């Protein structure tokens, strides 16, 4: 059956850096540890032949995707899909996490992590994101039985994918870690998350 490899880009901060909530308006490159994560992903998938590769316009996803497909002779062209761009965190964009929590509260952040309910002020069209993921899965049904496609995005976007697949693990944590991936298998019109939050 066909597979989609859903990857979250590597780190944009290293140990000792002030970590901020980096959204779609903040275009940071991968940090040193993020580049190492991209290399680890590339090595892990070195024997995987991707028939298609997609990412957002953001540097961090492009760098991660290019590392992963750059290992392959005859690799597919990297296609930018705007919907894969990280969400806009509104007034919390690029703010330190303690300031974000102080503004929205722990309960709002937990609702975002648990069921993807956007906090007040974040510019997130959850229904539209679910619909575009659903459309992508429908298109993926046309892949060949042995085909594998790569999709590199950000955590705020990937978290809406589990809402539209047909089958997923009961204990799935929708948050993808940096440099981690999930696997969606497509069998006809049925989609199934078989793995999530894996790292090399």
Q: What are these language model-derived features?
A:
Residues 47-49, 140-147:
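Glycine-rich phosphate-binding loop signature in dinucleotide/nucleotide-binding domains
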